[in-house]
Amino acid sequence: MTVIPASARIHPSSVIEDGAVIGENVTIGPFCHVGSKVVLGDGAEFLSHVVLTGKTVVGKNSRIFPNAVIGGEPQSIHHSGEETTLTIGDNCTMREGVTINCGTVEGGGHTVVGSNNLFLANSHVAHDCQLGNHIILSNNVMLAGHVKIGDRAILGGGSAVHQFTRIGRQAFIGGLSACSYDVIPYGMLNGNPGLLGGLNVVGMTRAGVERATIHRVRKAYKALFDEEGAIREKAAAIREEFADCAEVIEILDFIVAESDRALSSPFRGKS
């Protein structure tokens, strides 16, 4: 049985299915639908015409705008109605028309969105995506299934990300780009096909990365992408030189990690 706290404000036109968990100070505006397995954190706000379905958790103080559909079944031909989940962290904002799907059994069953994220209008997060914190998805961004995105990454409007692609921490994807391969932490990718275009120096500076550190990351980037040789071999060759630079080590670890996709590079073709 659903217990609605006295502090919650729910418009009489909205439907709250029996079994839903409503936190303190939750606001649910007109014509929303909250499914029976949905959990809404304290202080969350749903403006109007929001559909919350599936086995979905929305964190504290998150705001979801009209016509968003959160926790829908995965758009996968392999899905046969199994119960899978979606978890969204605290302080997230999902603007008009955002869609986020639950996971699939094949993908582990869980779609996860971290905290303090901003998803702008009509952006889509497909099944089994794993997103960190402080991420911005601009209008009409499309994430295919199983995509992984690190903290503080920014994706420009209309960009599309291929399934199983990894996007590293604080990377920047330009508007209308086609991101088909993994993007290193702090990398910038633009175009269709998407090509690596250097480092997100502006983002690094805003995040408080020291100028000397940025210089070292630039030096490592040149060694990785301007010199001849296989990328993994080059990553191994420079590891000792940059052992004291956490940002470079993060990039090197990303390069050698297991992945279903190749690595984005500054030139056409796979790296």
From Swiss-Prot:
First-listed, main subcellular location of the protein, grouped into a coarse class: cytoplasm
Subcellular location: Cytoplasm
GO biological process: lipid A biosynthetic process
EC number: 2.3.1.129
Keyword presence, Cell membrane: no
Gene Ontology CC annotations of this record: cytoplasm; membrane
Main enzyme class: transferase
Catalytic activity: a (3R)-hydroxyacyl-[ACP] + UDP-N-acetyl-alpha-D-glucosamine = a UDP-3-O-[(3R)-3-hydroxyacyl]-N-acetyl-alpha-D-glucosamine + holo-[ACP]
Top-level division of the source organism's lineage: Bacteria
GO MF annotation: an example: acyl-[acyl-carrier-protein]-UDP-N-acetylglucosamine O-acyltransferase activity
Cited Pfam families: Acetyltransf_11, Hexapep
Family designation: Belongs to the transferase hexapeptide repeat family. LpxA subfamily.
Protein name (Swiss-Prot/TrEMBL): Acyl-[acyl-carrier-protein]--UDP-N-acetylglucosamine O-acyltransferase
Source taxonomy: Bacteria, Pseudomonadati, Pseudomonadota, Alphaproteobacteria, Hyphomicrobiales
Gene giving rise to this polypeptide: lpxA
